[in-house]
A protein has these predicted regions:
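Structural marker of alpha-solenoid helical repeat scaffolds
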Residues: 8, 42, 76-80
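Canonical positions in the second alpha-helix
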Residues: 4-5, 38-39, 73
Length: 97
């Protein structure tokens, strides 16, 4: 279903994010990370994709990349005024040290 939506509109943030989440749930981390990255490439203000990409990277032990995703996500939060997500992501940054 999501693939069909993306065939019609490859920039659909919700569908692409959903596909990334499905890959992550299946343990397909590389595929999930690719889809999170594509989501933010097409939709740079789609904050959830940054946060979930960072969480996926943390699970994979890729802390430096997770920090970079969180920093990009914090910039998106600032652009969109998403204080709640910014607070959560800032907490993640602090936990990473």
């Amino acid at each position: 279903m999501l693939s069909g939506i993306l065939e019609q509109n490859p920039k659909d943030a919700f569908a692409r994010y959903g596909l990334a989440m499905a890959f992550a749930a299946e343990g397909k981390m590389d595929e999930a990370l690719r889809e999170f990255a594509t989501t933010t490439e097409y939709n740079p203000d789609y904050v959830p994709a940054y946060q979930m990409a960072a969480q996926t990277l943390i699970k994979a032990g890729r802390m430096d990349e997770a920090r970079a995703r969180l920093q990009a996500g914090l910039a998106a939060c600032e652009r969109t005024g998403n204080a709640h997500a910014a607070s959560e992501m800032q907490g993640m940054v602090e936990e990473l040290g």
